[in-house]
Regions:
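Multi-pass membrane catalytic core of lipid/isoprenoid biosynthesis enzymes
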Residues: 30-48, 89-133, 137-138, 175-188, ...
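C-terminal ends of transmembrane helices
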Residues: 19-25, 78, 97-98, 150-160, ...
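Membrane-proximal soluble regions of multi-pass membrane proteins
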Residues: 1-25
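Structural signal for membrane-spanning alpha-helices in multi-pass inner-membrane proteins
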Residues: 14, 48, 52, 71, ...
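Acidic (Asp/Glu-rich) catalytic motifs at the cytosolic membrane interface
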Residues: 70-108, 211-230
Length: 242
């Protein structure tokens, strides 16, 4: 049990910009840290829903800006960094070895900037076109994406240069993430008639499938790329599917 507690606070400290109340680290809890990503997603989802609620008191364009930026702000733009790195690598259309090298390059290329602008415009337009947004299903969108992230990192073949390449696959963390994903998708559909968490999961899976084929495996950057697009898909489903 202590490894799960360590894993939760390790995940909070690593994947959220909100100050962690207990900064701890235990190497044996690394897999539990990945499995606790959905719990971190719950915190991110609550912040996102709070920003959506606050946006009702702002002019529509400013409210949409707050809603669009909230999931990026709460993570300190961590996953956006992965999104940009993957876009740079994939859109270079070079051989696999070069794409993997570009993925680890700290420089920001033109493809990354263009894709970031398009991503922002899409997310802003989604919320600009929204009426009243149901908050509880929205809370579950980041949970769904991070449950998918935990499953992907703990089951898929990693890129050799990935920080997760030496991590053991399978086990209780995979079961936990799978149960969380199944539970929240079912809960949202049954209680609120919303398939937003399912749409977020579908967006994540498709993005990982594409990036995996282009880059030869799974990595933290690939997960950030897929998570960013998954959250956009979940928000779009919530706003546009009425």
């Amino acid at each position: 049990m202590s490894d799960w507690i360590y894993g939760f606070f390790m995940a909070w400290g690593m994947f959220l910009a909100i100050p962690c109340p207990k900064k701890i680290w235990r190497e044996s809890a690394r897999r539990k840290m990945v499995a606790c990503l959905p719990l971190v997603g719950l915190i991110a989802g609550l912040v996102w829903a709070g920003c959506v609620w606050l946006s009702a008191f702002l002019p529509l364009p400013l409210g949409a800006l707050l809603c669009a930026a909230a999931p990026w702000l709460v993570t300190g733009f961590l996953h956006l960094d992965g999104f940009m790195d993957v876009c740079d690598a994939v859109l270079s259309r070079r051989d696999l070895e070069t794409r993997q090298r570009i993925l680890k390059d700290s420089h920001c290329g033109a493809f990354a900037v263009i894709c970031l602008v398009l991503l922002f415009l899409c997310q802003w337009a989604v919320f600009l076109s929204a009426g009243a947004i149901p908050l509880l299903p929205l809370v579950l969108v980041p949970v769904s994406c991070r449950a998918c992230a935990a499953l992907a990192v703990l089951t898929l073949r990693p890129i050799a240069v990935s920080q997760y390449s030496a991590m053991e696959r399978g086990g209780a963390p995979v079961v936990f993430a799978a149960l969380v994903l199944t539970g929240i998708c079912a809960l949202s559909a049954i209680l609120w008639g919303s398939f937003a968490p399912l749409a977020a999961a579908a967006g994540y899976v498709l993005a990982v499938w594409y990036a995996d084929r282009q880059l030869g495996g799974m990595s933290g950057d690939v997960s950030g790329f897929a998570l960013t697009l998954g959250e956009l898909c979940g928000a779009a489903a919530l706003v546009l599917w009425r």
